Design a protein with these regions (language model features):
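Alpha-helix capping and helix-loop boundary segments enriched in small/acidic/polar residues
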Residues: 1, 7, 36-43, 80-83, ...
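Generic structural motif
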Residues: 12, 26-28, 55-60, 147-149, ...
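N-terminal leader/propeptide and maturation segments of large enzyme subunits in energy/redox metabolism
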Residues: 51-130
Length: 181
């Protein structure tokens, strides 16, 4: 299971967020009913591991270790090796701090307007690449039947792709997919 740590990048006056950096880390275990988390026979989200919803890991420059330990250890199905999770989270925070430092260096060297212009250029370029790839997709429908659920009910994934070649856009429709998937 992956955990994503997101940090704001503030302007030089610490008044306005100018960017965000993120670090997504794969954690070997986040609790749940089985080691490694995410068992295939889960019937609710808590069986898959500790549910972390918008938790502030760092406050005023201080890692909130006590509080995150409580979250990880006091869940219905807690993590099995909290010290490993803590070390991984600290590494993710360090990665975000490095990203913030590098962005700060770019802004100091080139100025915020140039850096934002390049970020917008990357976004626009990515959109062009994706739209060109979409224009090559053929309309299609798929239905995949899976093994029955633990209660014996049918499980399937249904997908249809409707491509607008002119707009280079696609609508992905999952109608007909089993609700809990």
């Amino acid at each position: 299971p992956d955990i994503t740590v997101v940090s704001p990048v503030w302007d030089s006056k610490k008044k306005k967020v100018i960017f965000f950096v993120a670090s997504r880390g794969h954690h070997t275990d986040v609790g749940g009913t089985t080691p490694g988390s995410m068992p295939p026979d889960s019937s609710d989200i808590h069986q898959e591991g500790v549910y972390i919803d918008n938790f502030k890991l760092v406050s005023q420059g201080n890692f909130r270790e006590k509080e995150i330990r409580e979250v990880l250890q006091n869940a219905k199905y807690p993590v099995r090796s909290v010290d490993i999770n803590i070390a991984d989270l600290k590494a993710q925070i360090a990665a975000c701090e490095k990203g913030i430092h590098e962005i700060d260096l770019m802004v100091k060297h080139y100025g915020i307007d140039v850096v934002k212009a390049y970020v917008n250029h990357m976004h626009n370029n990515a959109e062009i690449i994706v739209r060109n790839a979409i224009s090559k997709i053929k309309e299609a429908s798929f239905c995949y039947s899976m093994d029955p659920d633990i209660d014996g009910s049918e499980r399937k994934i249904s997908t249809s792709l409707k491509v607008d070649k002119l707009k280079k856009s696609v609508i992905i429709d999952f109608s007909g997919t089993t609700a809990q998937l």
